[in-house]
Amino acid sequence: VALGFEGGLRPGNLLYLNRGDLGFPRDQGGATRALFVVLRHSKTRERRDAARYQHVRITCATVAALLDRAFGQRDRAAALFSWPGNHAARSRQMSARFAAGLRALGVPYGQAQGYTLGGLRGGGITAYFEATGDLQLTRWRGRWDSMRSMEHYIQELASHEAFARLPPPARARIFRLAGLLGLFVQP
């Protein structure tokens, strides 16, 4: 969830990632504090005018530390999400686990009234824009050629409003869980 949100990734991007696609600062000789995520299976990779590989730069130290703890010691060829089955079966498994996590928090899930795995990209991009106020940086983060595509994401999603509409017990559980993050990672 943290990788999808912070990186503005599509669910399909997540399923194709392996450990070697995560460039932790130590992998780069400590020359940077950022985590780089290489997308070898991006949505636009087949277009002639598109880059073969795309990348995302994650600068949030807490998210980078969390991902390092979860995936950093794995073999570089190991899939990050190695559930059995074909791509469609793995996608269903990821969605089911995401839904189970939301249910445990009391957060609505589903297209009709709640959050979906696909919303991590839009929510992350919107949060990034709200934090930076910079359209060009946001466009780079979302990997869009067109400003118009980016505008749809930013105009349609108001993540702070969605959070405010959650039931108070769900918001309280989320804050408690967020407060525990520091026990698991040290940025």
What do these predicted regions represent?
Residues 11-12, 22-25, 45-48, 88-91, ...:
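Eukaryotic short linear interaction motifs
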Residues 3, 8, 14, 39, ...:
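Mobile genetic element proteins and their domesticated derivatives, centered on retroelements
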Residues 95-140, 159:
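Short, basic (Lys/Arg/His-rich) helix/loop patches that form interaction surfaces
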Residues 167-187:
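C-terminal secondary-structure termini that scaffold catalytic or DNA-interacting sites
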Residues 142-169:
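Catalytic-site neighborhood detector that most strongly recognizes the C-terminal catalytic loop/helix
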Residues 3-33, 134-140:
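Short, charged phosphate-coordinating catalytic segments
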Residues 3, 90, 117-118:
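Residue-level marker of regulatory loop/turn positions in helix-turn-helix DNA-binding domains and
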Residues 25, 29-86, 97-101, 105:
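Basic, alpha-helical nucleic-acid-contacting "clamp/cap" segments
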